[in-house]
Design a protein with these regions (language model features):
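N-terminal glycine-rich anion-binding loop in soluble enzyme alpha/beta folds
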Residues: 2-73, 140-182
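N-terminal active-site wall of soluble small-molecule enzyme domains
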Residues: 74-79, 97-104, 108
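Gly/Ser/Thr-rich loops at beta-strand to alpha-helix junctions
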Residues: 90-102, 114-120, 139-143, 211-217, ...
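Short, acidic/small-residue loops that bind anionic groups at enzyme active sites
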Residues: 104-128, 223-240
Length: 253
């Protein structure tokens, strides 16, 4: 830390609990999945302009996440506590369907928790005119139900238009079937096709939200194609980081 006169400040630091490393403000709970996580993905460290700390939730598969398996919660809580014990200031996840555990986990940890990209929906609604819709591109349209959304305080789906990738060949084989490889060009084409279809059907769409944590690499393409604001996991994580790690401003007048 450097003061304005460019002389090093004298500071005394104290160790915290049993930590052996420091400076990772955002903790990320990862699914137990063999999918390749490319730059831009939530599970790729090069996606961030700041250090993050990852923790795999053993046994928490993609199918369990999308299927709403409540039995995985003890493993999720154990992994989250490890992140907390290692000094993170806020905890997120790498699947929008982790929203099922949002309220319980934040209460049990007593710290900021933001597991799902879908938490941005109320914020986006306030940004755009009331007569405009939010387009959501998700890993599973079938599972993005009103009861599920109610778990994070979204009372109804009015104003939300949804397109699912569960039947898109590359997404299905790479993500849902976990074949162990991913063709990013094919994946991007599938995401852009869904975005284009949504916009064609709903010309009153005012913003797009990419639910799945694997989709941020394609967000710029979606924005370029549609001309709309695009939200995803990375917009949410960057936003929360800016709240839990405050910037010291410097300049002149």
């Amino acid at each position: 830390m450097w003061p304005l006169d460019n002389k090093r400040e004298s500071m005394i630091y104290q160790r915290k609990n049993n930590q052996v490393s420091y400076g990772e403000a955002i903790g990320i709970l990862l699914l137990d999945s063999p999918v390749p996580f490319i730059p831009g993905d939530v599970a790729n460290a090069t996606s961030y302009a700041f250090p993050v700390r990852f923790k795999k939730v053993v046994g928490f598969s993609v199918k369990k996440a999308i299927g709403g398996d409540k039995g995985i919660y003890p493993a999720l809580l154990c992994a989250a506590r490890d992140l907390k014990d290692n000094g993170v200031r806020a905890i997120t996840g790498d699947c929008g369907f982790m929203a099922l555990h949002q309220n319980r986990l934040k209460k049990d940890l007593n710290m900021p928790v933001f597991l799902s990209s879908l938490l941005q929906i109320p914020f986006i609604r306030q940004l755009i005119p009331e007569n405009q819709k939010i387009g959501i591109i998700t890993a599973s349209q079938r599972n993005l139900t009103e009861p599920f959304l109610e778990t994070i305080g979204i009372k109804e789906k009015n104003g939300l238009v949804v397109a699912g990738l569960e039947n898109s060949p590359e997404f299905k084989s790479a993500v849902l079937d976990e074949k162990g490889s991913l063709d990013s060009k094919k994946m991007e084409a599938e995401v852009l096709e869904k975005a284009g279809t949504l916009l064609k059907k709903h010309k009153d769409m005012g913003a797009i939200l990419l639910e799945c944590s694997l989709l941020p690499p394609y967000a710029k393409g979606v924005a370029d194609k549609t001309g709309l604001p695009v939200f995803d996991y990375m917009t949410m994580i960057d936003f929360v980081f800016s709240a839990v790690v405050k910037k010291k401003y410097r300049g002149y007048m």
